Amino acid sequence: MKLGEHEMKSNQSVADEIRKYMNYIYLILFAGITMWYYLYSTVLEYKYPYALYLGLRYALMAYVLVSIALVVWQKQYSTVLEPVFMVLILVSAGIVTYAVKDYGVFDFALLLVGAKNVPWKRIAYVYLCIAVVIQGIAYYASTTGIIADITMQADRGVRHSMGIIYPTDMAAHVLFIMLVYAALREKKLTFVEITMMGVVSYW
């Protein structure tokens, strides 16, 4: 084997090893930030440490920079414009964040760009686990009187928030949970599953 080919394989092996660990790092950061925003949408009294959230965001920013550098170094893009587009997403999100003073836009852009080369199933599974656990805790707390159950009068009756800050937000959370579950199944849902989803949606 030629020396040049050996070096190329060695570099590829190192890059693959780095990418594997970076996938785990991304999932940890994704989990932490998802928990922050999900808890923020509930009326649970637990206060997620803001310092921890800031640390996660800065770590995610560093991760994204390293990720883009690896994409360019290993030429892991379909066109030359792909890394440019990734940078433009971050710049645009940064401008919007500066204008509206809402870091949610920039955080979402960081998570979007950082997700490149991370298996989507792992991301979806992490989200589903976090969403189901927090939603379940919020539901239990609201139905047992531990926290307030915010209600809203609608045409078909009273709508309950089930521990979320607003009934429509709760409906959105439940919808996302069902969509992610259906996507992870990757096959036709059973009649029982469809019926349960219909009942939950109506409720």
Which sequence ranges carry the predicted segments?
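Short, Lys/Arg-rich, polar N-terminal cytosolic tail immediately upstream
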Residues: 1-20
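Short, hydrophobic transmembrane alpha-helix segments
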Residues: 37-53, 72-76
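Hydrophobic transmembrane helix bundles of membrane-integrated enzymes that assemble
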Residues: 17-37, 56-74, 81-203
